[in-house]
Amino acid sequence: MQPDFWNDKRAAGVPNEIDLSAYKSVIEVFERSCKTFADRPAFSNMGITLTYAELDRRSAAFAGYLQGHTDLKPGDRIAVQMPNVLHYPIAVFGALRAGLIVVNTNPLYTPREMRHQFKDAGIRALVYLNLFGSRVEEVSKDTEIEYLIEAKMGDFMPAAKGWLINTVVDKVKKMVPAYNLPQAISFKRALHMGAGQALIRHPVTLDDIAVLQYTGGTTGLAKGAMLTHGNLVANMQQVRACMSQLGDDGHPLIKEGQEVMVAPLPLYHIYAFTANCMCMMVSGNHNVLITNPRDIGGFIKELKKWRFTGLLGLNTLFVALMDHPDFKSLDFSHLKLTNSGGTALVKATAERWQQLTGCAIGEGYGLTETSPVASTNPYGGKSKLGTVGIPVPGTAMKVIDDNGAELPLGERGELCIKGPQVMKGYWQQPVATAETLDAEGWLKTGDIAVIDPDGFVRIVDRKKDLIIVSGFNVYPNEIEDVVMAHPAVASCAVIGVPDERTGEAVKLFVVARAQGVSLEELKTYCKANFTGYKVPKHIVLRESLPMTPVGKILRRELRDIA
């Protein structure tokens, strides 16, 4: 379907097109916002707030260090391997201003995963938090990394408090394993060296690569998606357009310089990178960075300090928050936007969230390869639970059969996406690029979807996750959605396993809530809710499920142990 199919289906206030010529690069977006909103808060973390003016100054200092004290050239790759701390936006925007390509790196990567990414991307510089120094020491000698910039948690605090925080993290909590990296320069020292240095402005076009974003690894060895300045600027504008939906007061939902957006999802993940780093910045809004969202008690304690208006999360995080006894004591009176992405939103979770907070969760859909947002639900009562909404402005979608032919509305097939946010390709992987992107620019997602006649898109499942039982198709998401509605189930996952009689059988893994649940209870529940071939033949109770650091359940690992 072409983009104009959705023109009469958008919420009031949401435009059908975006102006792709509005900005020349991510750098221009950043610098314009820092000037326009100079006195407004940009990022807060651990009791410290950076204004846009301070972010501008410190990122310029970091760029000055990179340009004046290293021999890094425009187009060289720099890895940024940090959780949600204030160093992150300073390093990322500083690197971009210096003309470098940013490679977002998960700080929880194993040495094997770090080696793969650093070698594949040809990393020449790495910014990391000292908590991960031992892993950096282990892998740096096997890579081409020449420059190490080491950050510490207390870097932006007053001297005495910063020293205390760094000492507690290292000596008391024992969070810093021993390592020896004498060649590393401290982040604070790099900023000091680069401060006041005139920036050399290298020409940057919308077609130049801004970020190498490695795919999550749920599908095997990670590949680097080449996201250009044009991709990121377009997706920022697309998401901003959706946030311009008119509220009940007749004004745009997201107002410039007035929002407090909570950022528990890691900024190194493309979802939070675009939504928090890019979208909130262009509108002059305030991101509250949550460094460790797994500490739910600490997360809720931080939420109590803010009159937050928006929250980006995903299903597992929403469940963990709602299960905490202090969640109900929070003030949700200002919350007007809750977005879910990264993994399927379970109906029971969405209904419970709205009941407890008064704010509906808007589910969207995206991929690393689409920078990442491809579709979103309208906000409020216009949201359609069980769908991922409609394509963001300027985006076309279609579903195809196994032969590549486009299917009519209402039929399920592989979802394909076309738009200005679609990646340039995979870094140094022309074969993988050709398999994913066709000559007309359509991206094959590998997801099975249905485009309903009203224009809303439903993701049925990943192509490879499809289970075929005696010739019947079983979609894991359907089983998981229903099982999650059981009051004693905290989380679950479904895979297909070989079966001599039926070809494949459904295997269900369940993590129970505190009150527990028996296998017999689950079997009875499934038989009451599913037709015969969908009923799990095998049910396993577990204490936990393997997940990515972002909270996406790794079915691949469950298959390995099945």
What does each of the following model-derived ranges do?
Residues V233-V260, Y268-T309, H324:
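Conserved AMP-binding/adenylation subdomain of ANL enzymes
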Residues A178-Y214, L221, L246-V260:
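Conserved pre-ATP/AMP-binding loop-to-beta segment of ANL
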Residues I390-G394, A405-T436, V474:
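Conserved ATP/PPi-binding loop(s) of AMP-dependent carboxylate-activating enzymes
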Residues A22, N45-Y52, A63-R112, N130, ...:
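Conserved AMP-binding/adenylate-forming
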Residues R97-H192, A514-Q515:
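Structural core segment of the AMP-binding/adenylate-forming
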